[in-house]
Each structure stands twice: as structure tokens, then as C-alpha cells.
Amino acid sequence: MSPLLEVTDLAVTFRTDGDPVTAVRGISYRVEPGEVVAMVGESGSGKSAAAMAVVGLLPEYAQVRGSVRLQGTELLGLADNAMSRFRGKAIGTVFQDPMSALTPVYTVGDQIAEAIEVHQPRVGKKAARRRAVELLDLVGISQPQRRSRAFPHELSGGERQRVVIAIAIANDPDLLICDEPTTALDVTVQAQILDVLKAARDVTGAGVLIITHDLGVVAEFADRALVMYAGRVVESAGVNDLYRDRRMPYTVGLLGSVPRLDAAQGTRLVPIPGAPPSLAGLAPGCPFAPRCPLVIDECLTAEPELLDVATDHRAACIRTELVTGRSAADIYRVKTEARPAALGDASVVVRVRHLVKTYRLAKGVVLRRAIGEVRAVDGISLELRQGRTLGIVGESGSGKSTTLHEILELAAPQSGSIEVLGTDVATLGTAERRSLRRDIQVVFQDPVASLDPRLPVFDLIAEPLQANGFGKNETHARVAELLDIVGLRHGDASRYPAEFSGGQKQRIGIARALALQPKILALDEPVSALDVSIQAGIINLLLDLQEQFGLSYLFVSHDLSVVKHLAHQVAVMLAGTVVEQGDSEEVFGNPKHEYTRRLLGAVPQPDPARRG
């Protein structure tokens, strides 16, 4: 039986002003009918370029070589009008950002119907509209008849992604290509979208190629996985074999860096040191060698081939025998055990009582009038203790970020009270508020947006010091000390943010936040924008800083696995209220509220054995 999709020696090169960049370097794989194959790897590994080459959606300046056969038909080299007969009919595509995949000026029903009419001209408009409603029902949109008349902006993010899936399966495709289909979604919505994709596969019988960096999604959904690094496949196997008996040190590192719900608070992860190589002019040898804990001289001379190491299991490594049976912590020589917390009651550094924050709803353009209000935070009470972490979790719109902003405002709330370091913020004068701000600093979600690209690292870190009267010598000494603390080199002080990886940028943001020796750090989704291998290093750094300096963390996140590693106490928010809070081990291990149980049940676990 011939495969549904057969890719052979696929290479993708992008012409640039400098050296050409070969983003995909001779990969080969196949997808059988009804099979789910996952491409996984860090950002820049070439997985999205490899997938978009299959469907012919790369930019014009991309050079594609090799062979891509769909049911025996060669797709590479087809003219665009010929390729368009495959797109949307034989091949359905689900993109990461549904808003960019949908036209804002047409209803979602019209957009699904259009996909049917383009590829099935004999189907009339009315029949296409009826089929569009059926597809909305299939992908789980409530009241599909009415919602088919909605515009994309009138739907939630999860609903928009369901519409994109409906368009992708509208013509019963043979192959579904899903490019990070759940990345931007809340955990419960992510679980629902995976269920919809499973249903779509079962209904259409399509093979699925899914691109993701989430190893939990791979374990939950995929049958086989291709691990990509520096533009090529470095390990491929069935998902059960890959997770149980991985043979490539890179795969070991990826799995070791994943936060887990079953880990104790304070457990260190296994980060992969360094960053992926530039694909413009790779050095000889194995591209992973500079980051590999098992590297030997032979690794630096020739790039290893992808060879069989077991039945249907291949790896590109000459040291696979040193990987078998060893943990990631052992291979990467990292101590992961949680360190015992100091005993005794710690003082309360942030106390929130009956906090309320409302936003007025207004109607009209010229003569606006109030028509109601939204209670973004509805009477919540929280406590953060010295040297501890309070995790505030919940889905988008739950009120967790609003709560954090109200605390950081250091001003009288609409209702209720906020105490920071024993002071009621409603009583603060201008000078007292400025002084207190030194003790509570923020690390933002997006390290790129929080750093001025025009300033070198030294100026970025020195800015709060200079604003608070530090002298020149004192500032230089403190910046050098902060670079040491967050694991950067002194020479990095003269470089600019654009020269650093995402994880290094976040370390710069943390160094800046620590400059004035605060007692409290507010962490607003500090690792959600990072690859899992980089995220692990930041989580370890935050744990080490808390242990070293006795910092207190207010940690806002939608990622329950990350919260489990960091938080001593957890508050679960829903619709502006705290529905459950307490010790993190108790809340995660024995949740009492149905919403908490639903959140925990939706988290994809990096263990195929737990697959439902």
C-alpha cells in the first residue's frame, strides 16, 4: 500500500541579502491515511518551512528541491493554478492564528461555503450554505445556524479556530496540515480543539501532519513524531517508543525541559544549554554538538546520518548507546530535586481583601451612555508571604491580569483594600509610592516588547539605577553583578537586544527587575513566549533567585504545569472570582472545585501512556 504523502530529500533555501539560508536540509518522511505525524522542535528548526513546502505556501524567493508526492502525484514544480486545485480540496490547512486565516468582512458561514463552491462548482449556493452549517455543528459551534451569520470578530479565539478547521475539512481532504493549531489558546480550549481535530480525522479519514513545539500535544494526539533540529530530522519513531526510549540527546533535552503536573513544587527542569545554530553557513559536524553533553571530537568532523536504532526508530547520533536507559538529568548533569523550603510562618508581603474592579459598558458614538458594567475582579482576597510564590491561574478573561495590575498600581482600588509590605496603598503619598515601587518590580510576558531596542544591555539594566541616584562606579559594579546573577557574560553589556535569543532577552528583563533589590517580583506570563527548552532555564533561574534572595513572587499564568513547579500557593480565578485557593500540592493533587478539575484535566501530559 502506497503512502498518502511521501516526502523525499526535501530542501528549502531562502535567498537573502547575505548568505542563503537552507532552512530545511534534505528531510524524508511519509504519512499514511488516517495517521497523525507530528513535527516537533525549537523555533528555527525548520518544521514550519518543511510543512508549508508541502502545500506550496512558501514565499516566491524560497527555492524548494526534492520530491513531495500526494497519492503518487508529484506536487513540487506545479504551477500555482494547478497547485490551487489541491489546496483546500485534497489538502486542508489549519494555521496558528485563525484571525489571519479568516476574512474579517465576510460571515464565517459564507467563508466555509466559498471553500466548498470553489472546489465543487456543481454544488449550489444554498447547498453550500447548508453544508457550512453542518460543518459548524461538526466542529462544536453551538447554535450553528445562527452563528454562521457571525463575523470572525464576534467569535472567541477557540471558536475562530473551529471555523478554520471547518474550512479545512469542508471538501473531505486526504491530508490535513496543522501548523501550531493550539498554541495561542487557553488550555481547556486547546483540549477541545484537539478533540475536534481527532473527530475531523475520524470523519474524513485524512492523514494529519501537525507542527508543534508542545510535547504534551504530541503525546496526546500523534502516532509518530519527527524531531527536527537545524533543518533536518534528527530522530523519528512511534510516539510511545520516542517517549520511552529516546536515543538522541536533543530529544532527551526536549523531554527533560517540559514542566509536569506530577512534579513537586521547586523541582528543577533540564534546560538545553545554548541556542540553535544559525542556518546560514553551518559549521562541519553535528549541528547539536556545541550544546550536547555527550559530544566527542568525532562529533565535530562529520554530521551523523539518520540511521535505524530499532524497528521503525531512527536517530542521527553516533552516541545513542550512552542515551539508552538514562534520565535527562543524568545525561545533562543537572540536579532536579526540589530543595526543602524553610520552615516557619513567613510574614505577609501582599494582602488583598475584597478587591473589586469594574469597567463601564457604554453605547453610542457621539452621545455615549452607560448601559452597564463588567466586574473584571469581583471581591477577591489573596495573601502572598515573604519568600514564597503565589500563582494566580485561570483562562483568558478570568481577571488574573487585572488583579495583578490593580496591585501594581499602588493606588486606592475602587473597592476593597490592598496592603504591600504592611502599608495600605490607599494611604500612600507621591514620595511614599515612589519609594515602595522600588520594592515591587515586574517581569513582562514579551521580553522583546519590554526592552528598548535602541539601548545596549548596560543602559537597559542601569536605567533604574541611574533614575534612583546611583553613582557611575556603583552602577557599573551593580550591572556586572546582575549579569552574573542571571547567567549572562560581562561582555554582553555592550550588545543590543536584537543580538540575543528569547531566553537571553528574558534574563535581561529579570536583571533589570532585580536592579533595585526588590522584595517582590510580579511575573506576568514570563515564560509563555519561550521555547520549552529555553523556558526550563528561566524557571530554574527564578527558583534559584528566590532561594538566594528570599524574593516573593506574584506569578500570573495560564500554564498550570509551570505554576506547579514555581508556586507554593495557588489561587484559581473564574469570571473575576477566586473559586479555589490553597497550598499548591493540595489544589493540584486534590482539587475541590469543578472548574479546577476541568483545568487540570485539559492539560496535555508529555506521556503517551496517559492518553485517553
UniProtKB/Swiss-Prot annotation:
Its main location: membrane. It comes from the Bacteria. ATP 2 binds at R147, G158, E159, S396, G397, S398, G399, K400, S401, T402, Q445, H558. It catalyses: a [peptide](out) + ATP + H2O = a [peptide](in) + ADP + phosphate + H(+). ATPase activity is stimulated by the oxidant H(2)O(2) and significantly decreased by several redox agents, including the reductants L-ascorbic acid and sodium dithionite. The 4Fe-4S cluster plays a structural role and might also affect the ATPase activity and the regulation of the substrate transport. Coiled coil: none annotated. This is Oligopeptide transport ATP-binding protein OppD.
